[in-house]
């Protein structure tokens, strides 16, 4: 459910790799919230990272498309959302695109070497 240590690039400031329990909890909440028609409904993903702080953002990697990542803003309702636009998709694309989106949105510069 979480990314393996060998496949872990540097993350932007404020993002962290989850421990196994956190990865499992984030993935389980995502699965509870996903309604039919959502971008991730039926898509195999693994918890890749999460943003620390007041946000409920988690970065999921598509297991069948290793360079596709989706940032989801979880609602933590503990049940299926009724609107297919929720939980909210904040980003969907490559890891490089994720880094660029973080920089654009929050002024967070990509880590060195990326």
Range-by-range predicted roles:
Residues 15, 19-22, 54, 105, ...:
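Generic ordered-secondary-structure signal
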Residues 25-32, 47, 93, 97-104:
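Charged/polar, solvent-exposed surface patches and flexible loops
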Residues 2-44:
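Negatively charged, low-complexity tracts enriched in Asp/Glu with abundant Ser/Thr
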Residues 68-113:
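Helix-rich interaction surfaces within compact, conserved domain-sized segments
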Residues 1-2, 114:
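Classical N-terminal secretory signal peptides
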Residues 2, 33-38, 51-55, 92-95:
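Intrinsic disorder and flexible coil segments
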Residues 13, 29, 33, 52, ...:
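Glutamate identity and glutamate-enriched acidic tracts
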Residues 39-87:
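Amphipathic protein-protein interaction modules
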């Amino acid at each position: 459910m979480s990314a393996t240590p060998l496949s872990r690039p540097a993350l932007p400031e404020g993002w962290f790799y989850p421990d196994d329990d956190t990865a499992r909890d984030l993935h389980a909440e995502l699965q509870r919230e996903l309604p039919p028609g959502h971008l991730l409904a039926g898509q195999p993903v693994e918890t890749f990272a999460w943003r620390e702080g007041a946000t409920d953002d988690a970065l999921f990697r598509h297991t069948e498309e290793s360079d596709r990542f989706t940032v989801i803003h979880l609602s933590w309702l503990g049940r299926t959302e009724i609107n297919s636009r929720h939980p909210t998709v904040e980003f969907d694309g490559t890891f490089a695109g994720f880094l660029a989106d973080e920089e654009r949105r929050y002024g967070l510069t990509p880590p060195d070497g990326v």
